[in-house]
Amino acid sequence: MSSIVVVGANWGDEGKGRIVDFLAEQASASIRFQGGNNAGHTVVNDLGTFKLHQLPSGVFNPDCLAVLGPGMVISPALLSQEIAEVEEAGVKVNMCISDRATLCLPLHALEDMLEEQRLGDKAYGSTRQGIAPAYGDRVMKKGILVGWLKQPEVLVERLQFMMDWKLPQLRALYPTFEFEQTAEEMANWLLEVSAPWRDSICNVTLPLKELQAKDKTLLFEAQLGAGRDLVYGEYPWTTSSNVVSMYAGIGSGLPALRPERVIAVAKAFSSSVGTGTLITAMEEQDAFRELAGEFGATTGRPRDMGYFDAVATKNGVELQAATEIALTKVDCLTGLNDLKICVGYEGDHSENPIWPQTAALAPIYEKMESWSEDITGCRKFEELPVTAQKYVLRIEELMGVPVKMVSVGPGREQMIMR
């Protein structure tokens, strides 16, 4: 048996979905353990191109159980829509959804939007999907559990309990807030939109333990990256959950998990979407962004583009307790003459910066040789141009962790194993 956790070393959008899709061919379960509809994983396979938000990326393997763990906040209508989209492509979804996961309601999305509007130029850059309010309700013990969809009377009671607490606050804080739906109406809507998957709700610990007992491979998939972790990311520009590998067990239903492999995924350059500091930001970003297709999978927002930040990435690799690295989008660097790696920071607090200290730091660069050859057809590391090999090996040296996977394109066959 092996437990493999796939996590982000940076700020998200590193290409975790395609790594999970690649590994899921040999896995018996693919598990999402945190987050919700706020970030997308792009998967390219024989069936097409998919932008998954709540389904695990291993859903395309018919022999792989897709698990939505208790650490998630689940948007019910959007989950039904996502299931319908992959089924339309010919995928038979084999799924379990934790009864302990939390529902992310349209009311949460409305609250999220109103708060971003209230904050104005101090907004967090939220995707406005309701993630922070849903997690906040869970912490305040007002959250709505997925398992209550199977207990309609309890569902109505808990919705009323939540609304009695929440609605007066929203009306007081946001003058434009309007919400007329009753608890009974909301419950009826929830039962309607969850119908396609409600039979999949269960205690997910049980099937996962059964697979462990049979010595099967379990694949755990994180959303976003270490730089967005609620505790260790660039607070307050973080997500609302823990995205580090140590949370995989807690958020999946296997709290005693001790993973054998932790794969930290990093792009061959730096990029970030949302508010925060990208210390290695390029002066001219537009052309490279278009070439690399760097736009948010959920919002379509253009990502900020930068040179590879070895300082931030090494911090992410260490936070994730990574045993290996998957380096993605190396092919996008072909023809980039101004190729360099940030190997340090200049400025106060450069050893362990927290915001806003990060905004005052300047990168220290190491110039690297570039290459002009098309590498998308390379299938062995030795087939890469020598300068591309040196680039990967320099990153490996700086990280202190082996780069075991090198991606030279979006297809499964374009993953070089070392």
Give the predicted meaning of each segment.
Residues 1-418:
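Non-transmembrane, aqueous-exposed alpha-helical and coiled segments at domain scale
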